[in-house]
A protein has these predicted regions:
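Short, low-complexity N-terminal tether/leader segments at secretion or assembly junctions of large
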Residues: 2-14
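Cationic, low-complexity basic patches in intrinsically disordered or flexible, solvent-exposed regions
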Residues: 9-12, 320-321, 326-327, 333, ...
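Surface-exposed repetitive/solenoidal architectures
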Residues: 12-324, 330
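Residue-identity detector for glycine
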Residues: 16, 315-316, 336, 344, ...
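Intrinsic low-complexity, disordered N-terminal segments enriched in polar/charged/small residues
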Residues: 346, 360-362, 374-377
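Short alpha-helix boundary/capping segments
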Residues: 349-352
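Short, intrinsically disordered C-terminal tails of secreted or membrane-associated proteins
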Residues: 366-381
Length: 382
């Protein structure tokens, strides 16, 4: 990627030295991500430009070592709905390294047109993707396309602690579409998809699932889907089409009417003692942390540890509160109207209402928040 600086004869001064430019351009490349790309020293990615640089480095790799470079996200990234070329566009150019989102979110992913292997990642083989949330949309019509919010194709891969908030529409013939992964092929080594969830609505022509569209050798467990799943043949809330010996385990989906044991109501998803407890599966090191209201879905759902900001476009944090000490607010709340906080006031008044805006500390400037205040005891857990 280059950027034009000058298009005329100019004399510049940079770092104490003069540069003479004759009717040309000064070009440059985005700042490289820090790190060396090894597992012990992964590239540190904090901006959309650096993520694009990382993608291009993988997609233009000349050797297998270059496709297995490793990276971590150090901040949430906004792709601004610019057309995205997936990382690892085909099986022959697959990404084979380890990518750790560190709990961050890549927002406003946009993929359209005739992309055959679609997702933030197109094809991943023999590596790992961890602790990553992706939000955006994919809308393609190409035949025999594979698509997932995280990856279109995953072979001998580990995908864990990942979430997709992507809306996916893949309507070409013989598409394989999933909330997390589109297609897991037959392989001597198993692909692992665990502790993941999908919120986005998924539409495919066939082989369409809330977690995986087509699964031949993947082990899928401790996952859930609350998105609407529609398509032709082999459509399911968890896995569209799969081998009998690879059925998902301890996975759940949203339904207020189904009698399937995997179907759970909105109330059960919001209850810490039901779906959240099932997903934890008795593990002390479980990534599942709490139940939080997710604006994208419009209901309260289990989320990962430290994922409070992932589902709010403005970075706000909405979640149930565990009360361990007194709660204070700066001023009274006007029920059904605006909540007004005055500058210079210190939070010093105990409140006993439910579902309130809570402040701790001193307000530095006047702010007015418009919100409907309602009583709902579920939002404060004693």
């Amino acid at each position: 990627m280059t950027s034009t600086a000058f298009r005329q004869s100019s004399k510049l001064r940079s770092r104490g030295k003069s540069i003479l430019v004759f009717n040309g351009t000064i070009t440059g490349t985005p700042a490289l991500a820090t790190g060396s790309g090894t597992e012990n020293d992964p590239y540190q990615i904090s901006t959309a430009e650096r993520l694009k640089w990382f993608r291009d480095k993988v997609n233009n790799a000349k050797t297998s070592d270059e496709t297995k470079i490793c990276a971590v996200l150090t901040a949430d990234i906004d792709l601004n709905n610019e057309e995205w070329t997936p990382i690892g566009p085909s099986e022959s150019s697959a990404y084979t390294g380890t990518f750790d989102g560190q709990g961050h979110t890549v927002r406003n992913l946009s993929i359209t047109g005739d992309v055959k292997r679609a997702g933030l990642f197109g094809c991943v083989i023999g590596g790992a993707i961890r602790k990553l949330t992706v939000a955006g949309s994919v809308s393609c019509t190409v035949d025999q396309g594979w698509c997932g919010g995280i990856a279109g194709y995953a072979e001998r891969e580990t995908i864990e602690n990942c979430a997709s908030l992507c809306t996916v529409s893949y309507t070409g013939k013989d598409a394989r579409v999933g909330g997390i992964v589109g297609y897991v092929p037959s392989s001597s080594s198993m692909t692992i998809i665990c502790d993941c969830y999908n919120i986005g609505n998924i539409t495919g022509s066939s082989d369409t699932g809330g977690i995986c569209g087509y699964n031949l050798s993947g082990r899928i467990f401790n996952c859930y889907n609350v998105g609407e799943i529609t398509g032709g043949n082999y459509v399911s809330k968890i896995v569209g089409y799969g081998q009998a010996n690879n059925n998902p385990t301890n996975c759940y989906y949203l339904s207020d009417t189904d009698t399937d044991p995997a179907a759970k109501t909105a109330a059960e998803f919001a209850d810490r003692t039901v779906v959240l407890k099932l997903l934890k599966a008795g593990r002390n090191d479980s990534p599942w942390d709490s139940c939080q209201y997710v604006a994208t879905a419009g209901i309260t759902l289990p989320v990962f540890n430290g994922q409070g900001d992932a589902h709010n476009a403005n970075g706000g944090r909405q979640e149930q509160l565990r009360v361990t000490k007194q709660l204070f607010v700066v001023s009274e709340l006007l029920v059904g109207q605006a909540a007004k906080f005055l500058p210079g006031k210190t939070a010093n008044k105990e409140i006993a209402r439910d579902n309130i805006i809570i402040l701790k500390g001193t307000v530095q400037r006047q702010t007015i928040h418009f919100a409907r205040i309602v009583a709902d005891k579920r939002h404060i857990v004693l």
